[in-house]
Amino acid sequence: MRNQTFIIVGAGQAGAMAAATLRQQQFDGDIILIGKEYHAPYERPILSKDYLINPEEAPKYLFSEDFYLEKQIDLRIGQLVSQIMPSKHCVVLENGGKLRYDKLLLTMGARARRFPLLDQLGENIYTLRTLDDAQRLRQAVKKDKRILIVGGGVIGLELAATSCELGANVTVIEQADNIMGRCAPPLLQDYLLNRHQEKGVQFFLDTNIVSAQKQGSELVLILNTGEKVIGDIIIYGIGAEFRDQLAADAGLVTDGGIVIDSRCQTSEPDIFAAGDVCLQREPLTGDLQRRETWENANRQATIAAHAMMGLAPPQPGAPWFWTDQWGINIQMVGNMQAEEWHIQGDLQSDKAILFGTENEVLVGAVAINQGREMRNLRKLLANPAQVVSGVEWA
């Protein structure tokens, strides 16, 4: 019987981790890992932080070159898959070559969402999704530069903190009336907003950009409030567009992302997907959920690798992610939309835990500079328990 061939399209966090997991689980067939970028798989979280701050900081690759050789993973960087042919179990490369697969894993991730109104201003418009993006930003963000960040989500705020630390003057423009609205409870939103403002970041919340123009080297934005903001460069932090067109063209079910089940299987039995490109259907509610985090990419990669081999996947834990801003480590686990939040510790001292509850049940937690406690919280929230009555929330 011939060896099976598993092809992975997308050589980011999820793709590389899936390939590694397949070998860890003793898959002895061929693994082909295809990546569009001209870089081996690398860690992305540092791109908005250490990599920008320290000019000597080198990219952090997920695995060494020797790893791919030793594990017999055929890593093909700088290649693009242009078509999937599910009925023939093959993918077509941009150069016209065809590769046959037994199982296919799609991990193409996402691209930064852009703002056409601002794109017309020229070359001083930046995004941050890739190592190449980070290298461009490294050259642009300098002392006394006026940085306009469009979007007050995690990436926008991390870039605001990093840019300030480099001596830039930073303004954040956010359409919503809060920051990190999709992923943080109100207590954390207010805390982070205060910290950024104390460091000199200017915020325009509940604000839209209605016009933009370039005057010499200056970028001038007019807001719906009538106010004018001027910058030297603009950085987008307005979310992502998911690279699901390849899947949609192949007839897979998509809905603003590739729809997968709890085993990371798509609507085609031999095609799986993992990471930022996915929408996963929750078994209990049937709702489609997207989680664009490092942890989720690793978790889904592991689940997909097991499923491709016909193995029982590991039990998923509660969703977890982190952000570092102003030297403050913030970790979040579970449901950030809980009905009630309780504080243990002192936010003013940058050391506290926020507990989210619904009907007296612990459903989420935020640890601020409390990394050790987060380990216990993650274990606890893997199997949610009734909060003990009588607990005093300090």
From Swiss-Prot:
UniProt-recorded Gene Ontology molecular function terms: 3-phenylpropionate dioxygenase activity; ferredoxin-NAD+ reductase activity; oxidoreductase activity, acting on NAD(P)H
Any Gene Ontology CC annotation: cytoplasm
Keywords of the record: Aromatic hydrocarbons catabolism, FAD, Flavoprotein, NAD, Oxidoreductase
Enzyme Commission identifier(s): 1.18.1.3
Binding, NAD(+): 146-174
Record-listed FAD binding positions: 5-36
Cofactor needs: FAD
Pathway note: Aromatic compound metabolism; 3-phenylpropanoate degradation
One record GO biological process: 3-phenylpropionate catabolic process
InterPro entries in the cross-refs: FAD-oxidoreductase/Apoptosis, FAD/NAD-bd_sf, FAD/NAD-binding_dom, FAD/NAD-linked_Rdtase_dimer_sf, HcaD, Reductase_C, Ring-hydroxylating_dioxygenase
Acyltransferase recorded as keyword: no
Catalytically driven reaction(s): 2 reduced [2Fe-2S]-[ferredoxin] + NAD(+) + H(+) = 2 oxidized [2Fe-2S]-[ferredoxin] + NADH
Family: Belongs to the bacterial ring-hydroxylating dioxygenase ferredoxin reductase family.
UniProt subunit comment: This dioxygenase system consists of four proteins: the two subunits of the hydroxylase component (HcaE and HcaF), a ferredoxin (HcaC) and a ferredoxin reductase (HcaD).
Stored NCBIfam families: 3PPDioc_HcaD, PRK09754.1
Known role: Part of the multicomponent 3-phenylpropionate dioxygenase, that converts 3-phenylpropionic acid (PP) and cinnamic acid (CI) into 3-phenylpropionate-dihydrodiol (PP-dihydrodiol) and cinnamic acid-dihydrodiol (CI-dihydrodiol), respectively.
Full protein name: 3-phenylpropionate/cinnamic acid dioxygenase ferredoxin--NAD(+) reductase component
